[in-house]
A protein has these predicted regions:
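Hydrophobic faces of well-ordered beta-strands that scaffold small-molecule active sites
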Residues: 3-10, 44-46, 76-81, 116-118, ...
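Conserved, mostly hydrophobic/aromatic
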Residues: 36, 44, 69, 108, ...
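Gly/Pro-rich active-site loop or hairpin
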Residues: 12-27, 55, 91-92, 182-237, ...
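C-terminal helical cap(s) of enzyme catalytic domains, especially alpha/beta-barrels
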Residues: 250-271
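Acidic/histidine-rich catalytic cores of soluble enzymes
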Residues: 19, 43, 79, 138-221
Length: 271
């Protein structure tokens, strides 16, 4: 059964940066954890930006974060490292990003956090011809024993066959974070994507039309019934994290997320 259903941080409280659909909720991160408990959401995926990275409570006071999560019965076993997308470590003069990632890996080891999601999209896209640099960078990270028990998962914008090729250069300390909405955006065939699903260890749930923006679940091109049926078939047991549409109207944010949560639970139940 698919039981590890959670939300990306910032999905129960108003956007603090109106121009961005995702950023760390500095003002309301504690409130959001309390709301997650109220609505019986068991998992939250933390998000870390490059700006003010060292001030983020997970970095500055990890044991306090652990205490607050435990008090509210919320599990944190995945983190999205948006800072890596914003300032890729393999680009010249981006040594801070490397330092940040190693610091984050140490905290993950301290708190027993399983996964760090590295978005290889936009500024950090493999399409920019950085494939060899990226592979060498992460293999060196593993060789220098920075990973320990934490696995690094890549969210990529490559066609399915190229995803298989890319992840094949890295061992089982690395995997794939699959994003339903991004797949729909690029118009990829899910049957082709199944070939690398043995390496998928975390899933971001969202809906989009081909070439379009994020929408309420069920309003885009993702066939969620087919998708959930496949996950049940392969006995997928890891996270399903809602990275769903965020309304600009602050009063509708929580309602939208709960509606999407009910949609995905209903789809699972119907199978």
């Amino acid at each position: 059964m698919l039981e590890k259903i959670g939300i990306m941080q910032g999905r129960l409280v108003p956007r603090e940066i109106k121009s961005r659909i995702q950023s760390f909720p500095w003002t309301n991160w504690k409130k959001e954890i309390r709301l997650a408990k109220k609505y019986e959401i068991k998992y939250i995926e933390w998000t870390l930006d490059y700006k003010n990275f060292l001030s983020n409570p997970l970095i500055q006071k990890p044991l306090l974060v652990k205490k607050i999560l435990k008090k509210n019965n919320i599990k944190l076993n995945s983190i999205t490292a948006d800072f890596f997308m914003q300032k890729p470590a393999w680009i010249k003069q981006k040594q801070k990003t490397n330092i940040f990632l190693i610091k984050l890996l140490n905290i993950c080891n301290l708190l027993n956090i399983e996964f760090i999601v590295i978005p290889l999209v936009d500024n950090s896209s493999i399409k920019k011809g950085n494939k060899k640099k990226i592979i060498n960078y992460f293999n060196l990270l593993k060789k220098n024993n920075h990973l320990k028990k934490t696995k690094i998962l890549f969210e990529v914008d490559l066609p399915p066959k190229k995803v298989n090729s890319f992840i094949g250069y890295l061992d089982k300390s690395f995997g794939i974070n699959y994003d339903t909405g991004n797949s729909a955006f690029f118009g990829y065939n899910f049957n082709d994507e199944k070939h690398y699903f043995k390496r998928v260890l975390n899933i971001h749930i969202k809906d989009r039309k081909k070439g379009g923006q994020t929408k309420t679940l069920g309003k885009g091109d993702v066939d969620f019934k087919l998708f959930i049926k496949y996950l049940l078939k392969i006995k997928y047991r890891n996270n399903l994290i809602l990275q769903t549409y965020m309304p600009k109207n602050d009063n509708k944010v929580t309602y939208e997320t709960l509606k999407n949560l009910n949609f995905i639970k209903k789809t699972i139940h119907e199978k």
